[in-house]
Amino acid sequence: MNINLTMIGQAIAFFIFVVFCMKYVWPPVIQALREREKKIADGLQAAEHAQKDLELAQEKVAKQLREAKQQAAEIIEQANKRANQMLEEAKDQARTEGERLITAAKAEIDQEKNRAKESLRAEVAALALAGAEKILETSVDAGAHSNMLDKLAAEL
């Protein structure tokens, strides 16, 4: 009988132990497992969200980089156009200035040529007058013979 009574006592003790565990031990363990499961699920969800955010950020960075490269290319193109335009303007200004200088030089040359002609005419007239005086051995009055001198100057 002792064996049966011992077994019954052990069964009752085991039953009390199981009830105690189910009432006081098992709920905190289950709650801890559920909390851990929730933390893991939240962590996975946060990781997925972070991965999506990372992909969006990478796409945004790539887009901004493309836009920046495009803007840089446009700025370089505009700078090249402006440089070419400035070069053409400088060429035009140099050409205009050269033409102006050539025109001024030609005008100055013409003036010098006319002055030289006038000077030569005056010298030739004086020489002709001196030659005529020597030929006639008389003094030729410039006032009296101005028509003759004008004709002579015009012919020269």
Swiss-Prot record:
InterPro entries: ATP_synth_B-like_membr_sf, ATP_synth_b/b'su_bac/chlpt, ATP_synth_F0_bsu_bac, ATP_synthase_B_chain. Keywords: ATP synthesis, Cell inner membrane, Cell membrane, CF(0), Hydrogen ion transport, Ion transport, Membrane, Transmembrane, Transmembrane helix, Transport. SUPFAM superfamilies: F1F0 ATP synthase subunit B, membrane domain. The chain crosses the membrane at residues 5-25. It is found in: Cell inner membrane. Pfam families: ATP-synt_B. This is ATP synthase subunit b. Disulfide bonds: none annotated. One of its GO terms (molecular function) is proton-transporting ATPase activity, rotational mechanism. F-type ATPases have 2 components, F(1) - the catalytic core - and F(0) - the membrane proton channel. F(1) has five subunits: alpha(3), beta(3), gamma(1), delta(1), epsilon(1). F(0) has three main subunits: a(1), b(2) and c(10-14). The alpha and beta chains form an alternating ring which encloses part of the gamma chain. F(1) is attached to F(0) by a central stalk formed by the gamma and epsilon chains, while a peripheral stalk is formed by the delta and b chains. Its main location: membrane. It comes from Hahella chejuensis (strain KCTC 2396).
